[in-house]
Amino acid sequence: MANMKAARDARSAAVVINAGSRRGAAHELAVDAMRKAGVPISSVHPVHSGADLAGTLDRVLADGHDLVVVGGGDGTVSYAAGRVAGTNTVLGVLPLGTANDFARTLEIPGNLSQACAALADGKVVDVDLGRANGEPFLNVASVGLSVAVTEALSPRLKRYIGPLAYSIATLSAYARHKSFRARLEFPEGDHEPMELEDLLQVAVGNGRHYGGGNTVSPTAGIDDHTLDIYAIVAGPLREHVSIARLLKDGSFIKHDRVHHVTSRAVRLVTDPALPVNLDGEIAAVTPTDFTIQRNAVHVVVPQGSTSALFDGPGAENWPPL
């Protein structure tokens, strides 16, 4: 990666595509577009399952490609980021999913041909990676309502109606939500423990966007080396509607029913124990230790992107010493 300033500077690039993602069928057009733009693609790997994705990523990394372009939704890209974290391999992103929030954070165009052009001519930056009991996430980890939303989001619903699927799934999940209690502990001592009751949701953000374009907080960033933690207290429907109206710009964190803090590490304990949603995938359970791996992933972004900087040739080791 030493001299890679753009994707076309790579010695060898592998493309890994989640064929089941919402726009996965368009991957051949994307590969052709990247090749014409000068990306030195030497292998293309459509995958059809999580196990297939894991094995394919292991193989392409072992083959020594210095650029791995991953096409899929946020769950696919987040998993791939966990595999390349702490290495000198550069990650390229093709937004082929429904929400594509990581791409939105990095200012990667949603239009596929524009995304291919931006990737070929893009610059390399470093971004942070969140960890939940060691499992990676790029955007947001959460418990509560968001898990029920994920469970209500069928692949068919996402494929046929796109981002609108999140609104439909949210209404369905809200109708059957049960509140819970949580304790937030801060191992670095930057906050006193927080005991919270009657909660709708707790979320821990590493990136800036989630849920199809919502904003974690007005100041959240993918390279600020900080986690944004918020908890929403259950209440009347009208209160939740007022919060929902503030999600797009992140100003909801100032609402009376929202608790918000920032930290580099937090432990979440809930009663009852709850599953944890990591970038759209249920991949952990409480109690959960959330940490941040600074500058963990080298990734290609458009030349005009201001989302992150390149801080150095190496990422922070994982696990931290």
Q: Where is each model-derived feature located?
A:
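Glycine-rich phosphate/pyrophosphate-binding beta-alpha loops
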Residues: S142, S146, A203-P218, I282
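ATP/NTP phosphate-donor binding region
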Residues: M1-V68, S78, T306-L321
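Catalytic core of DAGKc-family lipid kinases
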Residues: A14, A25-E28, K36-A37, V47, ...
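Short Gly/Thr/Asp-enriched flexible loops that form oxyanion-binding sites at enzyme active sites
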Residues: T76-T89
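Glycine-rich beta-strand-to-loop/alpha-helix junction loops that act as flexible
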Residues: A19, G71-G73, L94-L96, N206
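Gly/Ser/Thr-rich active-site loops/lids in small-molecule metabolic enzymes
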Residues: P155-A165, P218-E239
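ATP/nucleoside-binding phosphotransfer catalytic cores, i.e., glycine-rich phosphate-binding loops
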Residues: A2-K5, E188, G221, A231-L321
